[in-house]
Amino acid sequence: YKNKGKDWDSETPSQEYYDELFRVSKNQIIWGANYMVDKIKRPSMGWIYWDKQNGDSDFSDGELAFTSFNRALRSFKYHLSKDRHARFHPTQKPVQLYEWILDKYANEGDKILDTHLGSGSIALACHNRGFDLTGFEIDSEYHNKAVERLRVHRSQLTMF
């Protein structure tokens, strides 16, 4: 991916964002929440750890997500090199991670909200698992690429 000087990731969302998120949603999973605990203001034992299996590299060993679920911390091991798709978003996550999350945390009939759609990996996972998704992305370039990615994914599934 190329991050062409975008500055959308220069600060965390506002307190008003988190207040509204908790108002409109029953449960939450928030990636990068370890940088925003001062705004989340809720205890959680049910964090998710994505072990990126980077080995001895300069990149982060993993990512943390806050969850509102009263469960033990869970980890998911997956190296991005297993993905055969080119990355186009700097925080792109694998579809397999979102499928694992849906399998572990979502119930049939749940409606999924993603306020930071990014590359659209969650959209592919929701499509694969049969969940309704409402997604938002502030960057039109990423939004368009995510929509196209989902369109191609859906068309490939209907060919066979």
Task: Give the predicted meaning of each segment.
Residues 1-113, 119-160:
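Class I S-adenosyl-L-methionine-dependent methyltransferase catalytic core
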